[in-house]
Amino acid sequence: MRLGYALVVFLILGCASESQPKPNGYLRLEYPIPTYVPFTSLTNFSMEYNSLSEVKVRNQAIPKIVYPEMKATLYLNYATVNNNLDSLLNDAYKLPYKHISKAESIPEKIFINERNKVYGTLFSVIGNAASQYQFFLTDSIDHFLVGSLYFYAQ
């Protein structure tokens, strides 16, 4: 009987401690210092890309950049501006909003480089959407580039 009382007292006192919350854990991602390789397509389009990625040329010599270690692909589309900047901008703004049914929000970040006269917008598609980032860049006179970044994960 004494053993029963001692066991009950021990259980009550032993379980009275407050639980400690677990600290937040963060990923420690380390990437090598990037080195860049020049690329020129058959169209009026040239760029530099990361040497850890692979450039695969699609139709009309427009590349897609594959990052195998990250399971990511950056799809690019280039267009020459021929008095159709409004149409190109409308299409570029419509593209991220095709994900609105799956996205929680789509904040925009404006990019302006006055020195090189390059302007654009980065769309962060937050939520369970196929593409996490989409963007466009233009000089408003000759060149218009649209990109979509896809991560392949289940």
Where are these regions (language model features)?
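Sec-dependent bacterial lipoprotein signal peptides
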Residues: 1-16
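N-terminal targeting sequences that direct proteins away from the cytosol to non-cytosolic compartments
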Residues: 15-72, 80, 84-89, 104-106, ...
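Signature of long, low-cysteine stretches enriched in small and polar/charged residues
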Residues: 95-146
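A general structural-boundary detector
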Residues: 2, 40, 134-135
